[in-house]
């Protein structure tokens, strides 16, 4: 099955999406038993066929396990440091340091639930977070993973959270009173907002090579090296 997924063109695959799967625990589970026996075999097969392991929605121990088990560096394609904003989807310093040591990539997210002050997060705060992340992980291993759901109706996020796995409503990162897609910060409403990030990073001292790396070149280099 993993080979078939690769043959269809997929080059990244998550082991879990918020909930427990046959492969690993999701970040919303109360108990995180790590990568399962089947998960270990799937990681091995992903390494063989050239699919990058993505642990963006997975729990702490499961993510650390995946970093340790995978022969190739893994990616956390869309998340931020938990130390900056305490969202269950964001990642601990321990994970970021392990990711650094293994050569993995993180894509920093602009999804409001992952941002300090949500929709009201400022570009200055976001760029300071980028600088703080660069103290934990090599700057060449930092990219953007916007998690931008542009133009999607709220029915999409409702299906994503519930799918067919339960009759009761699960609001995930939202709440009963805030169940819809959150409004994006005004500095990143679509891809044109990357220019605002470029300007913000320049203002706090990043040079042109570092900025271009964060905004795309680092992911490009990762693709060239690890996607076959």
Residue positions per predicted region:
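Active-site micro-motifs of SAM-dependent methyltransferase domains
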Residues: 81, 150, 221
